[in-house]
Amino acid sequence: MREEAMKKQGVLVAPSIMGADLACIGREARNIEESGADLIHIDVMDGHFVPNITFGPGVVAAINRSTELFLEVHAMIYTPFEFVEAFVKAGADRIIVHFEAAENIKEIISYIQKCGVQAGVAFSPETSIEFVTSFIPLCDVILLMSVHPGFCGQKFIPDTIERIQFVKQAIQVLGREGSCLIEVDGGIDKESARACREAGADILVAASYFFEKDSINMKEKVLLLQGEEHGAK
């Protein structure tokens, strides 16, 4: 049922729970669901691959109990293989691992999929985008970091647009349109979202923009990120 949400036409919006009020994470998960967002992005950080430390399987399980939305774990950790089973048991519907985090990434992708969930690979901004080509036939999603991984509130890196275009073209050449999605994570707001959509992005991850307290409510922000310029009623 949750996987059907990934087949929806148009750009999917994935609020990152890292930007939420973590004192009431269950309520925030429900707020995301009520906003009309398509999935919840859960940033898992180990303090080694990136300097920040965030969530483990227990938090994923708590979010899973609070929502029916598709849950995506973005594993910014070394030795991701060791944690796959725990995150699957906690309720993850997709696990994304970093190209830079291990040498046996293709093995890890295969193992994630054998565990019955979707798999993806993330690429940091400084990593050559040409490495992506060999992963497109294997993955459900390619995630392009549009900031340096680790913290919310960073500015969108403009070079990401060319990287999206490269991946989009590679997906078309390899006949994987609709089977391998392009996800962009970092610095996403109304303006950068528009540029990403035009370049070919399928999923946009938003943290600071989505959760900041301002005059635009969450439902309106989802529509703006999707390209509905008039916002929600």
Swiss-Prot record:
Its EC number is 5.1.3.1. One of its GO terms (molecular function) is D-ribulose-phosphate 3-epimerase activity. Binds 1 divalent metal cation per subunit. Pathway: Carbohydrate degradation. Keywords: Carbohydrate metabolism, Isomerase, Metal-binding. GO terms for biological process: carbohydrate metabolic process; pentose catabolic process; pentose-phosphate shunt, non-oxidative branch. Belongs to the ribulose-phosphate 3-epimerase family. Catalyzes the reversible epimerization of D-ribulose 5-phosphate to D-xylulose 5-phosphate. NCBIfam families: PRK05581.1-4 (NF004076), rpe (TIGR01163). This is Ribulose-phosphate 3-epimerase. The lineage of its organism: Bacteria, Pseudomonadati, Chlamydiota, Chlamydiia, Chlamydiales.
